[in-house]
Amino acid sequence: MIVDCHGHYTTAPAALWEWRKQQVAGQAPGELRISDDEIRESLEGAQLKLQRERGTDVTFFSPRAGSMEHHVGDAKVSADWSRTFNDIIHRVSALYPRNFVPVGMLPQSPGVSPANCIAELERCVKELGFVGFNLNPDPSGGHWTAPPLYDRFWYPVYEKMVELDVPAMVHVSSSCNPAFHFTGAHYINGDTTAFMQLIQGDLFKDFPTLRFVIPHGGGAVPYHWGRYRGLAQDMKRPPLKDHLLKNVFFDTCVYHQPGIDLLLKVIPVENILFASEMVGAVRGIDPETGHYYDDTKRYLDSTTLVSAADKKRIFEENVLRVYPRAARYLNARCRARWTTGSPRPGWCRTPPWRSRGSSPCWPAAARRSSATSPRAS
């Protein structure tokens, strides 16, 4: 099974963006009206089409990261926007339970305690079945006014993460600082800064089961692994494998073969999760390869640096280990199809709770190819 842990709803219907425009302008936006057909239309020619073409079985789907915009408006504006967009993500996952697993955004706001996020986090996980969320280490939008991630300022949300057993992807939003292009600089800055902050603190002594995913291949971290090992050593911190790597993971949103190969050479396989962020920051076709930059599955399929068994860990097992609610979510959706009637065409024919192994149900075509495909070997 191919599980993409990093997807955003970048193609949401125009009505959502108009609602947001009115909200930011201080107007009462009224009730958001988006039909199921509009949602289907926004996905069928984009994310769903690419899933089919690239062989991805399921995508973890969250609000568009650049549109979280925690620096816009006050805490009330952020709360209303988060709830609205999270509800849309829930509708997507309900319409396409086989394709999308819901991941949320939080109503963060500069200078406001993350404790204000707990109600929305609980609602998303307990009521809507979300399996994780995005945590913005810089709600100021490129000015970095929040305390570092190891600071007790963040502890209320960490305590709830541990209680609910959900991880966070540490993901900044758009930048209002003209010095930092938001996807080319601010995103990579955010990934790198988050990792360095975690080196500086002792967060995981207080929260040994807390889990973070650092996206975009970890920013500059793998390329400068020796620097960070050396800094940790100079700071009298434990080796990184003991200090962070039981709790910190990296995704594969790296858009060329040498970058993926470097990630695989530096970071332990058990700390790498497959992701593409398709229809995201980089949407074009690489003229050197003739393929989309963000078709990251091709890079993993092509590499000879890891075994077929390790590829299976990256494509499936690591993701479901870091996001334990995702395995339960997928099994529940498959169970519902078995207990309410015939399974949807393309789904496996054996109820997953009666089969051996820990994997949830996945399309039968993927299972039939397991003998020859490295993704399922």
Tell what function each PLM region has.
Residues 50-57, 91-100, 164, 202-210, ...:
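A structural motif corresponding to the C-terminal end of an alpha-helix
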Residues 3-7, 59-61, 101-104, 133-135, ...:
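Hydrophobic faces of well-ordered beta-strands that scaffold small-molecule active sites
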Residues 179-200, 207, 211-366, 374:
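H/E-rich (His + Asp/Glu) clusters that bind or coordinate divalent metals
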Residues 6, 51, 89, 124, ...:
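Conserved, mostly hydrophobic/aromatic
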Residues 57, 63-194:
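Active-site gating/metal-coordination segments in enzymes
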Residues 8, 138, 173-174, 218, ...:
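Catalytic metal-binding/acid-base residues of hydrolase active sites
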Residues 1-58, 338-341, 345, 350-366, ...:
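An N-terminally biased module of ancient metal coordination in phosphate/nucleic-acid-related enzymes
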Residues 42-51, 113-123, 259-262:
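Short, acidic/polar
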